[in-house]
Amino acid sequence: MHSAWMAVTTIVFFYSRPSADALTLTAPVKTTHGRAQGKVYDFGAKGKVGAFMGIPYGRAPDGEFRFQKPRPARTWRGQRRFTQYGPACYYLAQNRKEHMPPIRFDEDCLSVNVFTPLNDDSNVKSKLPIMVYIHGGAYVMGSSATVGDEGIARILATQNVIVVTLNYRTGIFGFFTTGDSNAPGNQALWDMRLALQWVNENAEVFGGDKKNIMLFGQSAGGSATHALLMSPTTKGLFHKAAPMSGSTGENGITQPSVIRSQMLNLAKYLGFKPTNESSTKDTNIELVSFMRQVEPSKLALNGALSVNYNYSGNGQFKLIPVYDNEFLPGTLEKLKAGIHDVPLLTGNTEYEALAFFGKENVYEAAIGMATYYTKGDSMLAKTAMDYFVDKSLPKDSVEFMKQCILVVSDIIFNKDIYSLALQSAQKKNPVYLYTFKYFKPTPATQRYPFQGAMHCSDLQYLFGLNENEVYEPDLDDVIVSDQLSTYFVNFAKFSNPNGQNSEQKWEPVSDEATKPQYMSIDVNATQLHPVFMDGRMEKWNEINQQVNSARTFTRVSTLLLSMYSFSGATTQRMFV
């Protein structure tokens, strides 16, 4: 009887909704751009949170400023209310569910949302840590609204941290480049940097500590977090990082010429006719001028389509960060070597790539994805599938499908996360590695080959919102949400996910580790495990060696065959 009462009490307390009274406004705060008021969430015993929604950090990047670096927001006179999301940056929004807020699009979209505790406790006098979150969406979709507001206030901000979410340009707006000053590229990353500058400049007016800023993001937001960790332009703007289910590996960055070529094909598809295509300089000027005149909704549509079609018929491409001479200079190896010396919390879900599969033809789909995400390396893809997948199992068995999907998960996510963790640990930075394993089946998850924690499964436990369906937590959900959010909040506060009263101590990855330990996060089963992904990452070294040996053998055989053919032809001519 007592335990049942405690269970009900836990759910009511942890997920108590804010009062439904008329809108209550916060006291005004004086930001660097003007005076601002937000709205108040009252969670009863959990406390009150001020939500300042849609504060601009940058001017509209439209007209001649489309495809350029962002500019700081203009100041305003008087006092403004910020109680609703600002417009989202343009993207193709498909199948929005009724429980999600309506989306307004505008190129004037560079804004932040700030959630800060309104603490009346006289004992809480210190400045609060700040958690800055970058949303995901494959770099072509999404906005800060997709992670919600009330859940962030209730789950995170009531734990005495300030949370900031932000909009940034996605798709063509965020990554179109000509490789020169006409469209330098990496606009999205420059947006994030400007937002971080805004947070640093305004931290104290919201009660925050500008010397204790944590940057975190999921999926493309995790990749962006890694990119910001490697950029020399962002040093000092944040002090710890937590990339979730995403990092910047070989699939996450490219040369400007690649995107320029694809965008030139797209422009021609839309009607662009260069005057003199042999002149790169002239074509770039004309190309950017043309693309600035295209309706933003049309660019958003084609930016989303570009993930699957490159307008030249040669396969897929992505709108992603590029190497440049400023934000991401040099090679990937040099960028990784120059990663900021800050504490790191990073990890994955147990079956990341499960989110990309239907129930049919799992093996064939896995081969296709593995080939694509190894940049068309069919030999590597097939060798990996042969190594990890037991083909004696029935193709419709859960174990067979798990083995297939884990290979794709490794290629897209796990290998680069593992590499980031080891490389950062070798620089003597404290690194905490995890795998999120908790999963609760719902009607929306029945379309997948099996039930398990997949890409994005963890988000609702941090933010209290699921884009695909209404999130109605039970006791297990509450337990996991409490665990996961506490780990992230502790990391924001102490650069360490362990709290002062943690029952399960989370040890960091050793700087000498070749098989790093990790925290397995699951309901009533969260514990430290000795080897990340059960040693799968080390097995990829064997696979790469096999492939390299096979390629060497093929090259030598081809060379010997050509030499033999040449020798035979020469001998034949001698005796004619």
Give a label for each model feature.
Residues A7-V8, H99-N284, K334-F357:
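Serine-hydrolase-like catalytic core of hydrolytic proteins
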Residues D282, F290-V478, Y487, F494:
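Substrate-gating cap/lid region and adjacent catalytic-acid/histidine neighborhood
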